[in-house]
């Protein structure tokens, strides 16, 4: 049974983390992921308005602590940009985000690696390395988790070898890791019907020691589509059984496992409670020795 299982959770005015905590409790989560502000903006309210202390008091009643908190960095920064001004902006935004993570007690910050705009993939990867080393040097504790990407357009991070290239060049290895998104992994061409192959890919191209967070998502598209279109659990092309067996792996089941499946204003957060219940029900009957 996954120890840290939850979903994307809303974080917004007026109650911020208090409302996030209430939503997490309502869906019976043991983990949660939030953006500390609008996902497509670097704007953040002062930390003292985010109500983390009160939120943690609520979470404590359900034995949830900061080990289950994951923060997602804003989408607007491209840490792989060749533009010096955009690099400096990325450093500034990411540094501020990690400082907020430190105050919030968040161990992991998920980051999209960026795009190779008007440059080669290797040049973009080198720019990402440069930015990350500077940010890590300015900050402490929180681990930056590079998210695996589906391969749309100029995205970097569509292959674990690219992310390992970056990790190998980060000075402080304790501050860098990977967030594996199952929809992105599938859409990039990894076939979850061959779990032995999936685990071998992780072992040979990355190493399980760098796997820190799982985004548990279904996909609306075929393997290798490079589309990045999430589907709800048990309603996609990867297969519920394949996803469950994937997260049952001994080196995965204890990581924060976060659902980012589709929700609307009409079914949030109830849809996540239903999916978490489905996952736990599967684990209650799973017999690994029989498979």
Curated annotation (Swiss-Prot):
Disulfide bonds: none
SMART domains: AP2Ec (SM00518)
Any GO MF annotation of the entry: DNA binding
CDD domains: AP2Ec
Annotated protein name in UniProt: Probable endonuclease 4
Reaction it catalyzes: Endonucleolytic cleavage to 5'-phosphooligonucleotide end-products
Domain of life: Bacteria
Annotated residues for binding of Zn(2+) 1: 72, 112, 147
Lineage of the organism: Bacteria, Bacillati, Mycoplasmatota, Mycoplasmoidales, Mycoplasmoidaceae
């Amino acid at each position: 049974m996954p120890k840290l299982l939850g979903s994307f959770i809303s974080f917004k005015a007026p109650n911020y983390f208090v409302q996030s905590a209430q939503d997490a409790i309502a869906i019976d989560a043991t983990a949660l992921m939030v953006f500390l502000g609008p996902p497509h903006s670097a704007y953040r309210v002062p930390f003292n308005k985010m109500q983390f202390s009160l939120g943690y008091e609520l979470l404590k009643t359900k034995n949830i602590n900061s080990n289950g908190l994951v923060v997602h960095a804003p989408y607007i920064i491209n840490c792989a940009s060749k533009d010096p001004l955009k690099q400096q902006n990325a450093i500034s935004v990411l540094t501020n985000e990690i400082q907020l993570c430190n105050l919030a007690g968040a161990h992991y910050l998920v980051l999209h690696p960026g795009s190779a705009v008007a440059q080669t993939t290797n040049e973009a990867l080198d720019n990402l390395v440069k930015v990350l080393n500077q940010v890590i040097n300015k900050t402490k504790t929180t681990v930056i988790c590079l998210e695996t990407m589906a391969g749309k357009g100029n995205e970097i991070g569509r292959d674990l070898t690219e992310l390992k290239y970056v990790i190998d060049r980060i000075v402080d290895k304790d501050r860098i890791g990977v967030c594996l998104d199952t929809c992105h992994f599938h859409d990039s061409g990894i076939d979850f019907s061959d779990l032995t192959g999936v685990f071998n890919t992780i072992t040979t191209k990355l190493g399980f020691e760098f796997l820190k967070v799982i985004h548990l998502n279904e996909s609306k598209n075929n393997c290798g589509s490079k589309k990045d279109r999430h589907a709800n659990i048990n309603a996609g092309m990867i297969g519920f059984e394949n996803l469950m067996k994937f997260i049952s792996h001994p080196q995965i089941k204890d990581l924060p496992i976060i659902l980012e499946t589709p929700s609307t204003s009409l079914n949030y957060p109830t849809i996540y409670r239903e999916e978490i219940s489905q996952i736990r029900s599967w684990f209650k009957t799973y017999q690994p020795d029989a498979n």
